[in-house]
Amino acid sequence: MSRRIQVIGAHSADFVWRAGGAIAKAVELGGIAEVVAISYGERGESGELWKDENQTIENVKRIRHAEAEAAAAELGASFRALDLGDYPLQIGANELNLIADVIREFAPDVLVTHTDTDPFNPDHPVAHHAVDRARSLAAGAGVQSAFKTVRPPQLFLFEPHQPELCNFMPTTFVDITSVFEKKQAAMAHMKAQGHLQTYYAERAEHRANHARRASGNSEVRQAEAFQRVIPQVVSEL
């Protein structure tokens, strides 16, 4: 069976910067990838678009959707937007159930989202807690008779913009050397946040240095960092 990876971000561009390489790598290896945006980031993540004095919320959403859809396609993934609003992102019972339904529907082997702390972004921790809780609901052992459940997906956190301030501890490096050009092409679609392209290209090189030292593999030129949340179950060390 093809390995299934689902990346759920607070805003429509979050996946590109932080997990674009891992998504493309999974697809390159025969996997199936889905990107889910809880919101478009139309209020707090679209500064370039709001320089137009005639700009509107609906037009920003339209542009952000097109950008994210094109970026996901570059990586070989599908894109889905929940359009729940941002700044602030607010998750009630209905929104939580929607996210749980999205997880059940896709049934990922690997689920990726934000860290639980981010002092510079009010929406990222909200998204983390929502996805973490929705995962538990979607994979809730012992309640199969009440609603459909899925096999518990592995949960990873992608690297935040300021990792030292977000309690991020990398436990896994993904070698994205072979797909880095795809990540660059995907990032190029995000014109509403174009200033981040250089930052995350450089970050991939920094993490590749760490990956080389950790693995001894001198061929790693670009990498992405992730933090594993759920213990890995193996038959031997």
Where are the regions that the model predicts?
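Metal-dependent de-N-acetylase/amidase catalytic core
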Residues: M1-Q6, L29, P88-L237
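Active-site rim/loop-helix segments in enzyme catalytic domains that contact anionic ligands
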Residues: M1-F106, E236
